[in-house]
């Protein structure tokens, strides 16, 4: 069947045969190499990346500038998405933030996180009130401290 998708977990763990004078230069090379590999193999590459610590001290949603070790991640990627959930919130709502999309729109999608199954569930806006009422009284397995 062949290769249909390549997932890297995570970018900063990849080692190279060449020695670089900084992690920034190494991640830049890895990012560009993955972009070339995607073109060569004609498959999508999903590369997870660490964020720098500024997002923790600043609070709020992550930004493109929070990608750790290199601006080339932002530059090379066709799409950059973040998963964000307010740690202070009691809600199981998680946000998928589409911060860059070379060929499409950016924006946000809200999903419900089911910690007992480690899955995200799409919920339409009109269902949020019903979901909140059910989650509060039914013991349906949605646990908000597993994310």
Go through each PLM region and give its residues.
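C-terminal regions of RecA-like/P-loop NTPase motor modules
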Residues: 1-5, 32-42, 53-147
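Helical hairpin unit composed of two closely spaced alpha helices linked by a short loop
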Residues: 3-47
